[in-house]
Structure formats: structure tokens, C-alpha cells
A protein has these predicted regions:
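An N-terminal assembly and electron-transfer interface module characteristic of large anaerobic redox
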Residues: 1-502
């Protein structure tokens, strides 16, 4: 049995639980103990992570590793740490040690370009982002525009006002950290050139057309071109789905498969949409995602192994936008979309849906149509959570793994998790409890405080009731459900489902 060792980005469900739910029958997928991983702003234990990695990779065939976890202790600590470049370089040597003790192991790594969100909130950023996060983001945009020869007198004047507004020491702290993070990323590219890392994904978390992320992307591209390592390093929007993607790539290599993927959109204009928090049209990201799993895109249904259905309108809007009728009504045809996917199943194709019509939740209209057409469990994968790239990677990885393993039990269970979480919680329940939190003293949606148990019970009751009332086919597969808020906020929920024997 082939062994894949995973060091995830952190221990949130999307990084720690989702990989365990993949249809991976016949694969020994090895995870670190949760207690050595970080939690939000608390970094993971480097010493214990190093010990665990060196032990578990001795006899492993593949290592899927988040370098943000190894080097910084997790996705958020990478944005707030005060490690020196020398300290980080010492930690990076662990990757070479792993290859030295097991020269046959294939190492698939990922390392993020540090994000700079466009809003003022310190929930996952340095504390001073509460004061001027939006202004730091704008500062980065103007720096990028100047680098690209787009500076104007108006932008120069705005830049001067930003410099005066942002505390000098805080800005220096932020810029110094970005400089160190990109420096170590560029150094780690040499691990690819030196055959230590076999495949490297550089995801862009919350990217934008202009800004710090764009500046760092150019540095990475220049470095890749300089050392001629283009084939084994790719860079595209994403973050929390990348562990799934690299597991799928490993399983394809284990089975010597290169899955052929047909892409179908619910809107003819959908492929040209630039999703929220991303810097390019979705179809360009789809190409990278297919390449990342080790697949190839094809245009004919007859030759494909997998049909990736992408539910999207002619734009990506929020739920209550007044343009919804045009974007999701006139410019999209869900009936023919579902009809085509059903046709694919009749041809024995593996079929899944990446539900990216809205950011951060599922599309209820799609779920109702799938229910009415008896398609909820005819499809082989579904996701509709957080960003477009998160959803695309989750769906595609699940389809790819199922193509290799035909693990029916896990396939059904993962579908159920996604319907409960992406639709039931994120689309229905979360808004209700967020509105109720406004009436509770000492709680916000970013910190539940003393009302944690009260809010958790409310979430459980609402989720249980909604699925039982409106999606009985899904509800009937579940025996017990436990819920928790892993980061003490409402943005994500952790589900623990047990299933009825059928």
C-alpha cells in the first residue's frame, strides 16, 4: 500500500478533515497529531513537527507539505511572525534532510504568497490592520502601479497621504515581513532546481489585479524563468484546497493515470468571470488546477474521464444584489447544465460540480434542482465553499481521487459533508446566527466569547431542522451530528458526522 504523508496548512477542517474524507481507498494517508499544529495566530510546534516529519517520511512514497506550516507554524503565523531570515532558512533544511534519508520519496510542496486583504480587520492579520489594513492594501496597489509605469500626479498625492496616515513603525513591520517571506520563497525554488522538491504550487491567497501580491508574483516568475524550472512550479489563486490538489496528484502518479477532464459551465459567459478575491478569469485558474492534479483538459465528452461542471453566472455577486435576475437568470441556464451532467453519468463519466455562483456559500437554486432531479447522489463530487479556487480544487481533487479508487463509501460521505456544510451551514444557517449575534453582548461573528455554547446550539438546531425539512434524502444518511467552531468564530464550522449503515 502506497504511503502519502501530509503536513497541512493548519488544523481547520478544510486542511485537516477534508483530506481524510477524500475517496482514497487503498492509500495509507498519514496525518500529524492535531496538537502539534497551530491554531489561528498560535504557531505550530516546529520541533515536534520536524520530529514527526523525519520519522513518518522514512518509508513514505510521497510527502505533501505546506512550507508555511514547517517554516512559520501555519497560514496566519506566516503573516504575523517575527522570525529572522536565518531562523527560517534553518527550518527549511528539514526538506533536504527528508530527501537525504529517503531519496526515493517524491515531495510535493506548497508555499503561499503572503496576502494583503483590502479591508481593515486584524482577525487573521497583525493587530494594526484594525487601524489601517485598507490603507496598507492601497499603499501596495500604488507601489505596484508605479512599478508598471502607471503613476499619475493624483496617485502620487494619494500615496503621500497614505504614508502620513499609516504608522511608520507598523508599515516597516509589515514591509519587512513581506520582504523576508518572499526571500525565503525564492530560496525554496532552488529546492526544485536541485531535485529536492519534485512539484511546487505557489498559491495566491486573496489576490488582486494590483498590489503586494502582484509585486511578489513578478519576482517569482522572474526567478522561475531565470533558472528554467517552469515545468515543476505553478502559481495561481488559492490556498486551503492545495493539500487536496497535491494528494490527488500523488494518487494519479501512484496509479500512473493522467485523467482527461472536460469542463462545462452553467453560463456561456461564466468562463470569463474574475471571481471575488482573485486576479484573473476563472478559466485560466481551471487550467492550472487541472494541470496541478496531473490531468489534461479535453473538449469532447466521448474522450473524457471526468466532467467538471462549474456553476457560475455572468458575474459573481452577493446574494441580495439587484442584478441577480440578469446575472443568474437571463445569463445562466441551470436546467441544461444539470441535464448535461446527467447525460455524462449515463455515459459512465465521473461527474462533479464546483458551485462558484456565489463567494463563501452554495447556491440554493442549484441544490433544489439537484434534489428535484434526483441528482444529489448521482454526481460524484460537489463543493461550494469560500473562494472560487477553494471550491474548484476541492471538487476536482475529489473527482480525480474517485477516478483512481472508486471508493463509493467515502464518495457518498464527502458529498453529505459538503451539502451539510457548504449549503446547510454556509448558505442558510450562518447568516441567521450572524444576525442574532448582533443582539448578544460580548460576542461578534469573529469572536463568540461567553455566548459560544448558546450560538453553537442555535447553529446545530437550525442545521438539523433545515436539512430534515428540505433535504430529507441527505438527512437520512446521517446517524449523528456534532458541531463546533474551530476558530471561535462563525465563518467556518467543524462537523463530525456518523452515517447509517445502508
Amino acid at each position: 500500500m502506497s504511503k502519502i504523508v501530509l503536513l497541512p496548512l493548519d488544523k481547520r477542517p478544510c486542511n485537516y478533515i477534508y483530506p481524510q474524507l477524500l475517496p482514497t481507498d487503498g492509500i495509507n494517508l498519514c496525518f500529524p497529531p492535531k496538537n502539534i499544529l497551530g491554531k489561528k495566530k498560535i504557531a505550530g510546534d516546529f520541533v515536534k513537527i520536524k520530529e514527526w516529519l523525519l520519522e513518518e517520511t522514512k518509508d513514505a512514497d510521497f510527502l505533501v507539505i505546506s512550507l508555511d506550516t514547517l517554516l512559520f507554524g501555519g497560514i496566519v503565523p506566516a503573516r504575523i511572525n517575527h522570525l529572522t531570515l536565518s531562523e527560517i532558512e534553518d527550518r527549511a533544511k528539514v526538506v533536504t534532510l527528508i530527501k537525504q534519508q529517503n531519496p526515493q520519496i517524491k515531495i510535493f510542496a506548497n508555499e503561499l504568497i503572503m496576502r494583503c486583504p483590502s479591508y481593515s480587520l486584524s482577525d487573521e492579520e497583525p493587530d494594526y490592520f484594525d487601524l489601517y489594513g485598507k490603507e496598507i492594501f492601497r499603499y501596495g496597489q500604488i507601489v505596484d502601479m508605479e512599478n508598471q509605469g502607471m503613476m499619475t500626479p493624483e496617485l502620487a498625492e494619494e500615496f503621500e497621504s497614505l504614508v502620513k496616515f499609516i504608522d511608520r513603525n507598523d508599515l516597516k513591520d509589515y514591509l519587512d515581513r513581506r520582504q523576508i517571506n518572499i526571500a525565503i520563497l525564492l530560496e525554496n525554488l532552488h529546492l526544485v532546481a536541485n531535485k529536492i522538491i519534485d512539484f511546487f504550487i505557489i498559491p495566491q491567497d486573496d489576490s488582486n489585479e494590483f498590489g503586494f501580491s502582484s509585486v511578489d508574483q513578478k519576482k517569482v516568475r522572474d526567478h522561475i524563468n531565470k533558472y528554467h524550472i517552469e515545468n515543476n512550479i505553478i502559481m495561481y489563486p488559492g490556498a486551503d484546497e492545495v493539500g487536496l490538489t497535491l494528494i490527488a496528484r500523488a494518487i494519479n502518479q501512484i496509479n500512473n493515470l493522467k485523467p482527461k477532464v472536460l469542463v462545462c459551465y452553467s453560463s456561456s459567459k461564466g468562463q470569463f468571470v474574475v471571481p471575488s478575491f482573485e486576479d484573473r478569469i476563472i478559466d485560466e485558474t481551471v487550467k492550472y488546477q487541472i494541470y496541478a492534479i496531473g490531468g489534461i483538459r479535453v473538449d469532447a465528452c466521448a474522450e473524457c474521464d471526468i466532467i467538471l461542471g462549474i456553476n457560475i453566472g455572468s458575474q459573481m455577486l452577493t446574494k441580495n444584489d439587484k442584478r441577480s435576475d440578469t446575472v443568474y437568470g437571463k445569463n445562466r441556464n441551470l436546467l441544461t447544465f444539470i441535464d448535461y451532467l446527467e447525460y455524462g453519468k449515463k455515459l459512465n463519466k465521473i461527474v462533479g460540480i464546483a458551485d462558484v455562483a456565489y463567494c463563501n456559500s452554495a447556491d440554493e437554486e442549484l441544490l433544489i434542482l439537484l434534489r428535484n432531479q434526483k441528482m444529489l447522489y448521482k454526481i460524484d463530487a460537489y463543493a461550494g465553499w469560500n473562494t472560487s479556487s477553494n471550491t474548484l480544487g476541492t471538487t476536482l481533487s475529489t473527482l480525480s481521487c474517485y477516478n483512481c479508487t472508486r471508493d463509493e463509501k467515502k464518495k457518498t460521505e464527502f458529498l453529505t459533508y459538503r451539502y451539510y456544510e457548504d449549503y446547510g451551514y454556509m448558505d442558510i444557517v450562518r447568516d441567521v446566527i450572524n444576525n442574532e449575534i448582533l443582539t448578544l453582548e460580548g460576542s461578534t461573528r469573529f469572536f463568540l466569547g461567553n455566548n459560544y455554547d448558546l450560538i453553537l446550539k442555535k447553529a446545530y438546531d437550525l442545521l438539523e431542522k433545515h436539512m430534515k425539512t428540505h433535504f430529507l434524502e441527505i438527512y437520512d444518511k446521517v446517524d449523528t451530528m456534532k458541531v463546533s467552531f474551530p476558530w471561535n468564530r462563525t465563518f467556518e464550522i467543524m462537523l463530525d458526522l456518523t452515517f447509517k449503515d445502508k
